[in-house]
Amino acid sequence: MTRIRRGGYVFVTWVGDHPPRHVHVYRGGRLLIKWDLERRQTIVGTAGPRLRDIIVALQEEERL
């Protein structure tokens, strides 16, 4: 399991998790979204521009 904190959010991924490759995003211990890392879109929930920017930055840094 990988856990990254940034911008008040916690990003969690699991090795071997079901497809598509995705990240779970939490804030205050509550799941906000599941984000498809391949298609760069939400699977569950709604992501605002700030959160999308953080996810893209983490992908560009190869952290996700």
What is each stretch, according to the model?
Residues 1-64:
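Metal-centered catalytic cores of metalloenzymes
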